[in-house]
Amino acid sequence: MASYKQNLPPSALIKQQVNVADKKSKAEVQRDRQLEEDRKAGTAPAMVDVQTGRDINPHIPMFISQNPWYVPSEGPTLKHQRPHEEREKKMTQIHEWYQKGTTGKSATKFRKGACENCGAMGHQKRDCFDRPRKSNAKETNDNIAEDDYVQPNLTLGFDAKRDRWNGYDPSTHKQVIEDYEHLEEARKVVREHEMKEGEVEPATTEDGAPKDEDMYAEDADMAGVSVDMDSRTRITVRNLRIREDTAKYLYNLAENSPYYDPKSRSMRENPFAGVAGKELEAARFSGDNFVRYSGEVTAANEAQVFAWQATRGGVYAHSIAEPTKLEALKKEYEKEKSTLKNETQKELLDKYGGGEHMERPADELLLAQTESYIEYNRKGKVIKGKEKVAISSRFKEDIYPQNHTSVFGSFWREGRWGYKCCHQFVKNSYCTGKQGIEAETSAAKGTTTSNEEIFKVPKLVEKTEVKEEKEKEDSIKDEVAEENSDNDNDEEKEKVSEKSISPSPPSDDEEKEKEREKERLIEKERRERDQRRRDKKREKRERKKAKLGKRKRRHRDSDDESDPSSGSGSESDSDEEMRKAMKKAKREKAEGMKAAREGDRGRKYNTDYSNTAPNEKEMEAYRVTSVHSADPMAAYMNSKFEKKHTK
């Protein structure tokens, strides 16, 4: 601000008859500008506040330093920028506080405006805390209470409201000091009395001179020194570092010594590692690395790992940004984990038992003597004594379905389980007894037996046809036997000729040739047997077609007849029962394959069969639908049946 210009209202300008058209000349404006620059540079003196007498900063802009027209002033001033005294809130001084323990004087006569009940000034009858009197003080003028003391209305600031020492009188601490001094004097008197009676020996130094108990009294007020006043002999406790103490970074002055971090004042590695003759120092200080694994470090690391696992599982939790949330989640997780573990353990114990073994008996019972005698051999088996009771299964026992005499799983061969009584590998299949075992063993050895030796001939096949088939088989066997005999005669002739030519023993090539010849014969028999089986099946299909055609014709012919008990009706009923039995056999076979695929854990029930014995139709249907393991097409037929019923 270069110069002061009085800012007057229009009314004052009119009274003073100031001409508004008068303006400063160019030279005056230039002079004021130069003066302003000099004041800012410090070469010219600054303007002085007419009210406070202090210099006005020349760098203050004019719109701030110039007082408005409604604030009159005699010269340059900054009073308009400072807070107004009449608007300032007067705060309570530090020595002002509520008076405590005040008692007013009681009057002898009732005064106007006092409480009608107790007679004290300061409150009315409806606000009186005294017990309502039967005869109040206004009527009796007796036993008038003391007047109420009106506490001052203190205006406290932010810090004054939160000052814990507000209203404290330091002079009250003198009473505490005096109490301690009286206790100390009483202690000295009691100690002198005990020393005179000989109950306590006087304290002495190492040289035998009497020890001065007040030798550290002057140092008791020093920082870091505390005197134990309660013990019989005073002990000075110094928590400051002594001068002979060596800093961490001075233990090892080698160039490759462990690094000392001055910011955290830590040396993680051991400075005496590999230094001979420093075993005692290494025992006192071996580095600060142990701090990294002490305290809450392990818990913090576990929380961090839990946060990673929770985030991977879809629950976002940050160990640094949300520590409270992470701790709550971890507590809830540990609680649910322990609850689930206990529930699972309880379910297993309820299902299988053995809860009495989970609790450890007392040591007196474990180490006590018993009367039960048990003797073991070198292999750990019980020779004498009570053996362990076999654990009973939760499955039903002694139930053999489908005419079996053993359970499924009692026989094992080539990676498959089966029945021991008949060597069958299909579960819920009908038992074939010893014939099934013979067929299975012959198939395993390479020799085969016909189906007629294993299964009985169905009733639908006529006896004459069976006889014809047997005669054909016998004729084929005779032909094969003749061929074999011819081959044997030829071989004998060759052997005789070879013997006559060379009496040397047969070579390995001849033995291999004999084995190949046997294999060719076995293969030939197998092919012939397969051909006979195919011919039988073809004939069987033709007979079925012929019977179906006859049955249809009989149905057409019997529509006009009224007799329901004819022979065709009985045959149709038997055929219907046969079809139902065939469907049932196929359904049971499909269910058995499904159960075998699902396994013991997958299926719902362990027993899904009926205990009733099968009738003749069901047995016949089982024989018709069953595929023997010796059949070369057995694998193909089983796979085809499985594909058909798994769609």
Curated annotation (Swiss-Prot):
Residues 1-44, 193-212, 465-620 are annotated as: Disordered. Residues 21-41, 465-479, 513-533, 588-606 have a biased composition (Basic and acidic residues). Participates in the second catalytic step of pre-mRNA splicing, when the free hydroxyl group of exon I attacks the 3'-splice site to generate spliced mRNA and the excised lariat intron. GO terms for cellular component: cytoplasm; spliceosomal complex. A zinc finger (CCHC-type) spans 113-130. It comes from Caenorhabditis elegans. One of its GO terms (molecular function) is zinc ion binding. GO terms for biological process: mRNA splicing, via spliceosome; RNA splicing. Belongs to the SLU7 family. It is found in: Nucleus. Residues 534-555 have a biased composition (Basic residues). It comes from the Eukaryota. PANTHER family: PRE-MRNA-SPLICING FACTOR SLU7 (PTHR12942:SF2), STEP II SPLICING FACTOR SLU7 (PTHR12942). Keywords: Metal-binding, mRNA processing, mRNA splicing, Nucleus, Spliceosome, Zinc, Zinc-finger. Residues 480-491 have a biased composition (Acidic residues). This is Pre-mRNA-splicing factor SLU7. The keyword Zinc applies. Residues 1-19 have a biased composition (Polar residues).
